[in-house]
């Protein structure tokens, strides 16, 4: 028989004997249970696909956005200072070509801080709009708006670093911003003392907002008047992989509460279309400092914008950048911070007080009979708020009635989607809504509206809805133009959407406009403003909110949904129905529970490792990973799910208990408890998928690298020379280059060597089971390390490598190096009872930490896992 067929025959005989021997060692009492892990794999794949489809559907239904593209002619001039500040970063002055021709600075300084991997050139959209608007006003001589101030935009070049993933990068950038503020003010020393600016306005995008706030120490905060942030996660960090990042957020909150000179914060949020951050974190709690308070507003409620915006598009979206630029221009001419905040509210919130105009501004009047003491007038295609209402009873002189006015969207083509993709809303596509309250109904209302087109008048009615549906009681023609609904029992959570069904009567006019006003959580009131606009189209409207109760937030949930419907009496609303849509909870979980995908599979893997260790203590043999996984699926996993559900139920019953909102999935509503069990089963299935993939890769790698010599393989000691060489190289790198190479890189190299050792091991023996277990467990820890390696590699490439304080700590490199050493020497678990007992305790702590706080405080798992590996190695050596 030829050599190769003889070798394959002997190989098959060897494998059959090994499989039979292994089956005798670890018999499976219930053969059908071997399919449980495969079943969970299939469920995990199907559920992952369902989550993906739900996310896409949710974005299609609620996350569509429309913005007009912006254009500019940018130029940048780098500022050179004699004082040494940084050779790593730089500061530039923006100038719009063809407009900003002067070299000297005479305006109000605004410093732009880019976000994660952001470029300093992103300032060009807002800066260009500010320059164009300023010179247009000068040309038109609008002296009531322009007072000689213009905006000088400065922009920080932070080398497009990954500030969202690296806390020390955030700290270094904050120090540079502090120096920039001092240097910018020094650029105005050529002006007379009374004309020199004493404060700088900070404009920041994404994580640049965190950098800007971190720079506000007691000294620097005096030199800053207002901080404006765009799509910045203020409440929670986007990734909870570093303890130092949480420390930064805690320091920022402490400074905001205790530094009296801290500048007010204006946060502009993109809403549901922003999938890079959770817009729940863009909201702001209410901090009052004198008359200056922070405000957060979502772009869906900004007048003239009325659309959610993608994370990067919020910088260049024309409707937003025009309004921000105009707001900055107006604020630059205000004398104090209070006046600047009032200006900001006028441009961002449609901030209006009751207006009483003593004299009419138009000679033409329209008379309307009074149908109710509360009336709402709708002026179609009215971009102006010049509105006067007078109440006349025939016996006395007409008197002016106070009115509350606002501009709402009103597209020219009602058949187009709202907002229109690629264009959004036009400045002329608005309608004026004026609300008045009369003293009696036996009067006539005169409206001065000569410059307006069609004006519709009707009553304003309030409806308190106990259930989920409201229906018109009368069959008479409707005289109502404004409905206000309060569904007081509606469940509120940022994880839940509601489907709103509007039934219309015979329609001869424009379709009704629906305004959904989100009621913020208690601690967000007076600081966070969110509203969304929809048009009745015959299809269900999906209502969502970011400022209500959200995961991991200590805010109490509130019940009730508020709606306003503006309609023509010729197209009345007949019925309004509201129902919860639990399927979209999966879509909302994508951005809010990213860390669950990392933390909970580690918890399940720790359960498997604990089961293997306990089985070894009882039998003296190492159970294969996949066999242990199947037994966990049959016995331990259901118990763990029940414990998770029990813990989440207790959490929902104690919403006011300190820090309890950070446990499990961070939800305080009983209706959200099943989500804990669903994600628990899903993450267990993900572990099964990862385990089978790694096992298959190890088998394939073994087939590639193994070189057969007859039916016997070389001894482990002679095959492990390459492994020993790797251990020596890694040890030398860890000791000799301790200040250069981060421990995360050493960990990754050790995982690679563990894979090679597992692939070279003799299959189906205790040594192979031990090495494959170590390879699978350490592979699940790679996501906790890979970001640091990516940041370090990029910094090496750009010549600005920097490590955090623990990156060069050899303590974190000891366990993987020793694991590779044990794998190379053929070590196996010894019955050292003290080490095994300590290792079991550490495993239990890691399990509890993974499931209880791993979704919020994910960084806590890495040091605990490191301790587990140390104790595990101690039981092997």
UniProtKB/Swiss-Prot annotation:
Residues passing through the membrane, by range:
35-55, 597-617, 637-657, 674-694, 735-755, 771-791, 809-829, 834-854, 857-877
- Top enzyme category: hydrolase
Query: Which Gene Ontology cellular-component terms appear in the entry?
Result: endoplasmic reticulum; endoplasmic reticulum membrane
Q: Which residues form the active site?
A: 206
Q: Which UniProt keywords apply?
A: Endoplasmic reticulum, Glycoprotein, Hydrolase, Membrane, Protein transport, Transmembrane, Transmembrane helix, Transport
Which InterPro entries would you find in this protein's record?
A: AB_hydrolase_fold, PGAP1-ab_dom-like, PGAP1/BST1, PGAP1_TMD
In Swiss-Prot or TrEMBL terms, this protein is called GPI inositol-deacylase
Source organism of the structure: Cryptococcus neoformans var. neoformans serotype D (strain JEC21 / ATCC MYA-565) (Filobasidiella neoformans)
As recorded in Swiss-Prot or TrEMBL, the protein's gene is named BST1
């Amino acid at each position: 028989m030829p050599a190769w067929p003889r070798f394959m025959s002997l190989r098959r005989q060897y494998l059959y004997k090994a499989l039979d021997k292994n089956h005798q060692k670890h018999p499976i009492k219930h053969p059908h249970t071997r399919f449980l892990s495969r079943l969970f794999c299939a469920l995990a794949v199907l559920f992952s696909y369902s989550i993906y489809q739900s996310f896409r559907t949710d974005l299609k239904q609620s996350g569509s956005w429309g913005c007009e593209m912006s254009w500019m002619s940018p130029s940048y001039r780098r500022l050179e200072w004699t004082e040494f500040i940084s050779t790593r970063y730089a500061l530039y002055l923006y100038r719009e070509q063809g407009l900003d021709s002067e070299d000297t600075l005479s305006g109000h300084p605004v410093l732009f801080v880019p976000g994660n991997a952001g470029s300093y050139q992103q300032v060009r959209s807002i800066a260009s709009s500010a320059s164009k608007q300023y010179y247009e006003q000068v040309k038109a001589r609008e002296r009531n708006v322009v007072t000689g101030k213009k905006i000088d935009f400065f922009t920080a070049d932070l080398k497009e670093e990954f500030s969202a993933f690296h806390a020390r990068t955030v700290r270094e950038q904050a120090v540079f911003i502090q120096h920039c503020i001092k240097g910018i003010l020094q650029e105005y020393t050529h002006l007379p003392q009374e004309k020199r600016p004493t404060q700088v306005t900070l404009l920041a995008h994404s994580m640049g907002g965190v950098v800007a706030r971190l720079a506000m120490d007691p000294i620097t905060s005096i030199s800053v008047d207002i901080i404006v942030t765009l799509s910045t996660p203020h409440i929670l960090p986007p990734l909870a992989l570093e303890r130092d990042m949480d420390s930064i957020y805690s320091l920022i909150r402490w400074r905001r509460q205790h530094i009296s000179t801290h500048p007010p914060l204006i946060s502009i949020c993109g809403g549901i279309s922003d999938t890079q951050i959770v817009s729940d974190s863009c909201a702001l709690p209410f901090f009052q400092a004198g008359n200056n308070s922070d405000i957060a507003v979502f772009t869906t409620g900004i007048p003239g914008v009325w659309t959610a915006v993608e994370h990067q598009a919020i910088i260049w979206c024309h409707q937003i950048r025009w309004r921000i630029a105009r707001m900055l221009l107006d604020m630059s001419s205000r004398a104090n911070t209070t006046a600047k905040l009032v200006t900001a509210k006028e441009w961002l919130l449609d901030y209006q007080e009751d207006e009483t105009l003593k004299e009419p501004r138009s000679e033409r009047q329209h008379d309307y009979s009074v149908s109710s003491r509360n009336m709402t007038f709708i002026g179609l295609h009215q971009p102006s708020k010049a509105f006067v209402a007078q109440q006349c009873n025939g016996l006395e002189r007409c008197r002016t009635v106070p009115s509350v006015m606002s501009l709402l969207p009103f597209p020219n083509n009602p058949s187009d989607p709202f907002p229109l993709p690629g264009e959004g809303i036009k400045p002329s596509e608005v309608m004026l809504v004026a609300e008045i309250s009369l003293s009696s109904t036996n009067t006539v209302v005169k409206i001065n509206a000569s410059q307006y087109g069609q004006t519709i008048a009707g009553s304003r009615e309030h409806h308190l809805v106990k259930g989920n549906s409201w229906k018109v009681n009368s069959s008479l023609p409707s005289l109502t133009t404004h409905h206000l609904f309060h569904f007081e029992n509606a469940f509120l959570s940022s994880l839940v959407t509601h489907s709103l069904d509007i039934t219309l009567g015979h329609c001869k006019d424009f379709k009704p406009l629906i305004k959904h006003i989100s009621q913020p959580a208690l601690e967000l009131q007076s600081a966070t403003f969110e509203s969304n606009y929809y048009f009745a189209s015959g299809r269900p409207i999906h209502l969502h909110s970011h400022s209500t109760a959200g995961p991991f937030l200590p805010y109490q949930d509130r019940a009730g949904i508020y709606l306003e419907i503006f309609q023509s009496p010729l197209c009345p609303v007949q019925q309004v129905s509201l129902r919860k849509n639990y399927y979209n909870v999966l879509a909302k979980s994508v951005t809010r529970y990213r860390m669950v995908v990392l933390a909970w599979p580690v918890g399940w893997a720790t359960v498997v490792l604990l089961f293997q260790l306990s089985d070894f203590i009882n039998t003296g043999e190492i159970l294969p990973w996949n066999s242990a996984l199947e037994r966990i699926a049959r016995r331990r996993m259901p118990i763990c799910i029940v414990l998770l559900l029990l813990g989440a139920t207790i959490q929902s019953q104690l919403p006011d208990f300190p820090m309890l909102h950070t446990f499990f999935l961070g939800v305080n509503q009983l209706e959200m408890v099943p989500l804990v069990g669903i994600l628990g089963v899903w993450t267990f299935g993900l572990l099964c998928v990862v385990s089978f993939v790694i096992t298959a890769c190890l088998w394939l790698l073994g087939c590639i690298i193994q070189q057969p010599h007859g039916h016997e393989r070389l001894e482990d000691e002679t095959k492990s020379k390459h492994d020993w060489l790797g251990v020596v190289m890694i040890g030398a790198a860890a000791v000799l280059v301790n200040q250069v190479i981060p421990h995360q890189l050493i960990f990754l190299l050790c995982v690679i060597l563990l894979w090679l050792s597992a692939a070279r091991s003799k299959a189906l023996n205790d040594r192979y089971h031990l090495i494959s277990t170590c390879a699978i467990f350490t592979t699940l820890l790679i996501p906790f390390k890979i970001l640091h390696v990516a940041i370090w590699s990029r910094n090496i490439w750009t010549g600005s490598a920097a490590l955090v304080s623990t990156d060069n700590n050899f303590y974190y490199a000891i366990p993987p190096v020793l694991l590779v050493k044990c794998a190379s020497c053929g070590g196996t678990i010894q019955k050292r009872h003290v080490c095994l007992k300590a290792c079991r305790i550490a495993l239990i702590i890691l399990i509890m930490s993974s499931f209880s706080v791993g979704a919020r405080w994910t960084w806590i798992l890495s040091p605990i896992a490191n301790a587990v590996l140390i104790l595990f190695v101690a039981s092997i050596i």
